[in-house]
């Protein structure tokens, strides 16, 4: 199932079937192009455990929302993937924010969908904290190979 079907309020397009929240069909040549006013896409993958402090990203999103009120920044769609013990806690915390410029979705992505999502992102955020201070998160190392 497509993410736009699971999250139509965030990722859905126009009623014409020729656009999404991010793209539209160029009427002149039929090519697909990015919408000028599309939201930016931020992607992060987390295991929702204490060694990946989502609180840092949550604080950054709150600040971004505040800045959107005083300067022309794009709306933001945050795609935060993963499963783990603190996921529902943060889902409730996000829901309570009632952000106007930020929408957060928390899908589970199949392995074949993950590189497609990363390729669509404007920004990727890694929340992993290294115990040694010098290693890369395993997912980054896997995708680099």
Predicted features and spans:
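Helix-loop-beta element that forms the nucleotide-linked donor phosphate-binding surface
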Residues: 1-18
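Conserved donor-binding/catalytic core segment of Leloir-type glycosyltransferases
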Residues: 11-15, 27-52, 58-63, 79
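Short gly/ser/thr-rich secondary-structure transition/capping motifs
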Residues: 24-26, 105-108, 132-133
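Nucleotide-sugar-dependent glycosyltransferase donor-binding/catalytic pocket residues
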Residues: 47-53, 62-65, 69, 83-86, ...
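Nucleotide-sugar-dependent
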Residues: 52, 110-117, 122-145
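C-terminal, well-structured subdomains that either form a transmembrane helix-short loop-helix hairpin
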Residues: 57-58, 120
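Nucleotide-activated donor-binding/catalytic signature segment of Leloir-type glycosyltransferases, i.e.
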Residues: 68-82, 87-116
């Amino acid at each position: 199932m497509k993410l736009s079907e699971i999250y139509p309020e965030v990722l859905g397009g126009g009623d014409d079937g020729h656009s999404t929240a991010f793209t539209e069909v160029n009427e002149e040549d039929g090519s697909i192009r990015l919408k000028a006013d599309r939201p930016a896409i931020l992607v992060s993958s987390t295991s929702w455990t204490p060694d990946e402090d989502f609180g840092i990203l949550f604080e950054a999103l709150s600040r971004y929302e505040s800045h959107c009120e005083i300067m022309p920044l794009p709306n933001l769609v945050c795609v935060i993937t993963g499963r783990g013990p603190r996921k529902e806690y943060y889902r409730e915390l996000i829901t309570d924010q009632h952000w106007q410029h930020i929408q957060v979705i928390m899908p589970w992505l199949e392995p074949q969908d993950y590189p497609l999502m990363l390729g669509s992102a404007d920004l990727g955020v890694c929340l992993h904290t290294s115990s040694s201070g010098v290693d890369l998160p395993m997912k980054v190392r896997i995708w680099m190979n």
